[in-house]
Structures are given as structure tokens and as C-alpha cells.
């Protein structure tokens, strides 16, 4: 294991009553796997400079400073050796030359691949995503200067320690997201960086530095998001919606994040997801937030906070867009008072989701079905009794769908301005979900024939029956009787029912 200890000197105002800054010393160590250290030292011993760089360095520092546990899967290596020289250094090992035109050589070592890339600079981003021109450069600083954020522009090797020309370690310590150099240039080079910046801020509790924030909000920059593929947009959105719940554990932080998305980045997000504008200026009378988008964002954050990592991407999308059709579903039913309601809100919201959101993303068929089903049933009233829960489970089609609906209703209710007995209602919802789990786990609710506690072979043996229409009729009848509560789903009960009702067929 390669390791080097570095003292990070951080200027802070330790005493709130004093404007005098103090210096706080923080020890940061970098531990490298044996194979990574071997690669670095082999290059160094051949006369080249070599460092690990990027996410592995950033997350190592974060894990030590904040006691987080970000997994480190890849170690990207940068060097002043050319691709040809890299291949000469590692000629005794299997080399995968797929990235040579970008200056990257992949070396296979102990059944694991490692990417080694020559120092380079990039220019001419005609598609605002990929560099048209790549040139090799001679210094590490030139290579680091092309990177997106200061926190990603830190290099390390076990002989020199950390190399940090843009003060990325200080920005990590201060939880600051800052572009390297001119933020407008960095974001126009690769428009996807805009979403990465917002993702880092929302998932790690970092603050976006002012000039970087202005660049994100600049339409001359975010307009290029239209050129980013649906796959990459969806991938960033998935990462953005997965968050450490401890980062949003107070209402103040939730308010800050909602305010950030609503006030600062709405226009940017609307470029990739036009459905946001449909909820922008529509007021919500029952929410803690006067605008509907605020309520939907609050529902999203409540979902993530209350259920930690036990929620799906589909559920997040429903939290965001369950009311997207409210403009079009509104009906004034009392002209005198102006009282209104929203018949067919679920159907309208599904229609608007298909028209305004779905074309912008790349979702699986399973996710699309989940999202549309949950939007349709979002406002269903849940009654905590066996018959109702059985019917609702069958209507939704799975315990997982019931669980998702339960999570959404809890998250939504936590933003209900007029909750008279919030704890009582939340307990009621929880008991409903527990009853659903009990019914499914005890096989008192059967979604499919295979859930019956009797097999087709058992029926054939009981009745000496060949597979055919009668056979299917028996299985379907058993399924219906179990779900109606007329028959227990035990082998003994099912066998008796078959012998009593089908023995002569």
C-alpha cells in the first residue's frame, strides 16, 4: 500500500467574536492499492512522472475529512509519458489500446484494468460535449487546468504527496464547488458539467461558488444542454436523486435546496425537463410552499429523508411530477365562491408526463409503467382493513407498488399544511403497509397462479387430469377464491376445495 501524509492548513474564523482568522491543521493520508503503487513507481523508475488523479483523490480526502464512505472503484493515472512510452514500460503486461487517440492506454494487472493517460489539453468543443482537438502537454499543471472542478484537479503520488495547484483541497474542506479557471469556458466546453456541479452540491451538501453559480444560470451556457443525449441526462439525474440522507436532515437544509432549485436553476432544469414550467406558477393552498413545484420538491426531499436509500428512481420521478397535469384538470364547481377541484388529475398528469418529460429521458419500460401507475393512484385513499388492502394490492399488481405508493403518501403528507393529527395519520399509513406485507408474506393475497400453495402437478394427481381448459379454469377459480377471502391459501384447504368442486369434471 502506498501512503503519504499531508498537512492541510485551513484558514478559519475559529472564534465568532473575533474577526482574526486562525489556521487549522488537518492531516490527510492517501492509501493506494498495491497494483496502483506498482504502476506509479514503475513509470517513475523509468524516468517519467506519474500520479493518480480525479475522483479517487477527491473521495479519499472527503472520506477522511467528513467521515463519509464514498466507494473508490477506479484509480485514474496521469503521466508525462506518451502512449507509445507507456506501452514500452508495460510491454510485459496485457495492454488494451482502445483509447490511444485520446492518449489513454489500459493495462491489465491481476485481472483488473487501469487507465493511464498522457498529460493533455483539449480544445474546440464543437458539440459542447467532446473535444475535437487533443494535444499532449509537458506539465501536470497544464493537464489539471483542463479539468472541470478544483476538487477534481488534485493529483497524488507516494513520493511527492498531493499536488494541488488550484486549491481543491481547501475547497473540499470548505465544501465549495468551484470551476477550474473561467467557469463559463469550462461549462461551454462540456454542458453536462452543469448537471455535475448541481449533483455534487445536492448530493454532498456542498455550496456552489458564486461565479460558478452565475455561469450555471447563464442561458448562453445551459442552452447547450439540449445537445446532450437523453442517456447522459438520465444518468446524471439518477445520480442526483441518490443522496446521503444526513445531508438533508433539517428543514432548513430542505428549504435551502428547494429555494436553490426553484429560484436559481429552474430555467436550466426546464431546458432538459420542460415539465418543470407546468408547475412553476401554479399555487398550492395545502402545502408549506405557496407554489406547486415547491410542494413537489418538498415531497421529493421528504421521500429521500424518511426512507434513506430504500426508494426507487421511479418513486422520485413521481414525487416530482405527480401534479404536472393540475393546470389542465382544474374545474370550478362553484362560480360564486370560486371553489375548484381536479377530476381526472391522475390521467391528465400521466398525459403531460408522457408529452413533456418522457421524451427527454431514457427510461426502461418497467420504470415507465411504474411511474404512470403511481401517478394514477397517487391520491388514492388508503383504508386499513384486510378487504380494502387486498383489493388495492391486486389493483396495483405487486407489494412493491404498494410500498412505493405508501412512501409517496407519507412524503406528501409531511408537507401538508393542514395536518391536524400528523403522527396519527402517518401511523395509520404505516399500519396499512404492514398489513399489506403480512397479507402477501402469508400468501393471503396471490398476484399470480404461481403464488398458490398448490402446483399443477398436484391437481393432475388429485383429479387424474390432463392439462387443458378445465385445468386452467380450476387454477383461476382457486386464485379468485383466495383473493376474495373465501379460501385460505394452504395446500390442505385448496386440496379440499378441488375435491369438493371439481372431482367430477
PLM regions with names:
Residues 1-505:
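Catalytic cores of the polymerase beta-like nucleotidyltransferase superfamily
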Amino acid at each position: 500500500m502506498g501512503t503519504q501524509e499531508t498537512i492541510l492548513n485551513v484558514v478559519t474564523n475559529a472564534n465568532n467574536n473575533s474577526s482574526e482568522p486562525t489556521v487549522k491543521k488537518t492531516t490527510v493520508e492517501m492509501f493506494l492499492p498495491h497494483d496502483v503503487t506498482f504502476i506509479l513507481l514503475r513509470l517513475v523508475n523509468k524516468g517519467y512522472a506519474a500520479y493518480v488523479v480525479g475522483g479517487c483523490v477527491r473521495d479519499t480526502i472527503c472520506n477522511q475529512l467528513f467521515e463519509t464512505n464514498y466507494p473508490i472503484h477506479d484509480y485514474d493515472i496521469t503521466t508525462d509519458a506518451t502512449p507509445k512510452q507507456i506501452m514500452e514500460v508495460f510491454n510485459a503486461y496485457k495492454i488494451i489500446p482502445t483509447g490511444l487517440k485520446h492518449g489513454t492506454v489500459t493495462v491489465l494487472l491481476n485481472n483488473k484494468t487501469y487507465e493511464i493517460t498522457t498529460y493533455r489539453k483539449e480544445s474546440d468543443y464543437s458539440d459542447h460535449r467532446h473535444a475535437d482537438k487533443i494535444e499532449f502537454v509537458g506539465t501536470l499543471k497544464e493537464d489539471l487546468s483542463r479539468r472541470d472542478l478544483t476538487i477534481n484537479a488534485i493529483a497524488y503520488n507516494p513520493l511527492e504527496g498531493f499536488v494541488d495547484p488550484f486549491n481543491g483541497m481547501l475547497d473540499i474542506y470548505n465544501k465549495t464547488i468551484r470551476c477550474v479557471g473561467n467557469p463559463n469556458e469550462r461549462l461551454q466546453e462540456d454542458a453536462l458539467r452543469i448537471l455535475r456541479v448541481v449533483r455534487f452540491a445536492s448530493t454532498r451538501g456542498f455550496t456552489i461558488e458564486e461565479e460558478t453559480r452565475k455561469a450555471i444560470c447563464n442561458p448562453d451556457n445551459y442552452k447547450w444542454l439540449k445537445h446532450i443525449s437523453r442517456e447522459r441526462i438520465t444518468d446524471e439525474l439518477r445520480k442526483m436523486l441518490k443522496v446521503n440522507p444526513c445531508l438533508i436532515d433539517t428543514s432548513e437544509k430542505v428549504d435551502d435546496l428547494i429555494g436553490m432549485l426553484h429560484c436559481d436553476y429552474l430555467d436550466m432544469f426546464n431546458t432538459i425537463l420542460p415539465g418543470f414550467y407546468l408547475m412553476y406558477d401554479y399555487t398550492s393552498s395545502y402545502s408549506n410552499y405557496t407554489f406547486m413545484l415547491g410542494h413537489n420538491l418538498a415531497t421529493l426531499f421528504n421521500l429521500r429523508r424518511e426512507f434513506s436509500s430504500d426508494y426507487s428512481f421511479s418513486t422520485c420521478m413521481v414525487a416530482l411530477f405527480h401534479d404536472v397535469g393540475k393546470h389542465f384538470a382544474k374545474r370550478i364547481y362553484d362560480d360564486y365562491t370560486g371553489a375548484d377541484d381536479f377530476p381526472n388529475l391522475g390521467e391528465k398528469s400521466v398525459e403531460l408526463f408522457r408529452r413533456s418529460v418522457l421524451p427527454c429521458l431514457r427510461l426502461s419500460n418497467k420504470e415507465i409503467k411504474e411511474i404512470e401507475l403511481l401517478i394514477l393512484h397517487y391520491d388514492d385513499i388508503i383504508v386499513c382493513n384486510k378487504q380494502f388492502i387486498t383489493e388495492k394490492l391486486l389493483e396495483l399488481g405487486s407489494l412493491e407498488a404498494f410500498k412505493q405508493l405508501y412512501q409517496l403518501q407519507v412524503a406528501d403528507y409531511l408537507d401538508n399544511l393542514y395536518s391536524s393529527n400528523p403522527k396519527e395519520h402517518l401511523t395509520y399509513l404505516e399500519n396499512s403497509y404492514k398489513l399489506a406485507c403480512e397479507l402477501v408474506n402469508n400468501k393471503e393475497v396471490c398476484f399470480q397462479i404461481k403464488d398458490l400453495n398448490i402446483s399443477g402437478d398436484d391437481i393432475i394427481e388429485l383429479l387424474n387430469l390432463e392439462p387443458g381448459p378445465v385445468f386452467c379454469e380450476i387454477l383461476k377459480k382457486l386464485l379468485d377464491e383466495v383473493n376474495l377471502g373465501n379460501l385460505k391459501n394452504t395446500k390442505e384447504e385448496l386440496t379440499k376445495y378441488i375435491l369438493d368442486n371439481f372431482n367430477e369434471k
